[in-house]
Curated annotation (Swiss-Prot):
It comes from Salmonella enteritidis PT4 (strain P125109). Pfam families: CTP_transf_3. Belongs to the KdsB family. Coiled coil: none annotated. GO terms for cellular component: cytosol. It comes from the Bacteria. One of its GO terms (molecular function) is 3-deoxy-manno-octulosonate cytidylyltransferase activity. The keyword Transferase applies. Pathway: Nucleotide-sugar biosynthesis; CMP-3-deoxy-D-manno-octulosonate biosynthesis; CMP-3-deoxy-D-manno-octulosonate from 3-deoxy-D-manno-octulosonate and CTP: step 1/1; Bacterial outer membrane biogenesis; lipopolysaccharide biosynthesis. PANTHER family: 3-DEOXY-MANNO-OCTULOSONATE CYTIDYLYLTRANSFERASE, 3-DEOXY-MANNO-OCTULOSONATE CYTIDYLYLTRANSFERASE, MITOCHONDRIAL. This is 3-deoxy-manno-octulosonate cytidylyltransferase.
Length: 248
């Protein structure tokens, strides 16, 4: 099947300045992400960035770049600019791969594209089971609950679903009911155009989760269990050192 990967790569980062260009074992991080995307079999891969240094690094690795504005409030807004500049048809399947995921398995990039292509829905994503209490109660681990058909009912930083009887006895085990959302999305290009036309929702501001805008406006998001678990993403200097060690 045919799909396009877009990798948003914003240069500024409060916790890790110049993040796309940090060195991981001899290569800029954004080049590692580009290589994982190539392994997925995508028809076209575009790095969307607001900085010339990132563009030069990608082009030196043989990648395609789309320069975008620096004032976007979200990665989805940056995607929308690329969709318009490249003139993608409304039914084009686009996978948004985060630019700080150098260890993302190529198989899940393709998985989210295939899941979307098989359904009459505008957006798809992935999740993995949560097995530790630490992760279940961590607000940085976003949880998702699904309906019987695998569509998202809600995303939250809170522990959902709340296992009343189990947690009344102990908060040290979580059972097998919690799912952690992964930050990879598949969209149809026409859906991205609609998404950015909607006003931000109250829920996305409360939880700071932009995917809640989709549910707020009554649209569906399909969620599948990922075929592989992504490695560590890079948000901080500590994450960077961990990834360098894991990728040696």
């Amino acid at each position: 099947m045919s799909f396009v990967v877009i990798i948003p790569a914003r240069f500024s980062s409060t916790r890790l300045p110049g993040k796309p260009l940090v060195d991981i074992n001899g290569k800029p991080m954004i080049v590692h992400v580009l290589e994982r995307a190539r392994e997925s079999g995508a028809e076209r891969i575009i790095v969307a960035t607001d900085h010339e240094d990132v563009a030069r690094a990608v082009e030196a690795a043989g990648g395609e770049v789309c320069m975008t504005r620096a004032d976007h409030q979200s990665g989805t807004e940056r995607l929308a600019e690329v969709v318009e500049k490249c003139g993608f048809s409304d039914d084009t399947v686009i996978v948004n791969v985060q630019g700080d995921e150098p260890m993302i398995p190529a198989v899940i990039i393709r998985q989210v594209a295939e899941n979307l292509a098989q359904r009459q829905v505008g957006m798809a994503t992935l999740a993995v089971p949560i097995h530790s209490a630490e992760e279940a109660f961590n607000p940085n681990a976003v949880k998702v609950v699904l309906d019987a058909e695998g569509y998202a009912l809600y995303f939250s930083r809170a522990t959902i679903p709340w296992d009343r009887d189990r947690f009344a006895k102990s908060l040290e085990t979580v059972g097998d009911t919690c799912l952690r959302h992964l930050g990879i999305y598949g969209y149809r290009a026409g859906f991205i155009r609609r998404y950015v036309s909607w006003q931000p929702s109250q829920l996305e501001h409360i939880e700071m989760l932009e995917q809640l805008r989709v549910l707020w406006y009554g649209e569906k998001i399909h969620v599948a269990v990922a075929k592989a678990v992504p490695g560590t993403g890079v948000d901080t200097a500590d994450d960077l050192e961990r990834v360098r060690a894991e990728m040696r």
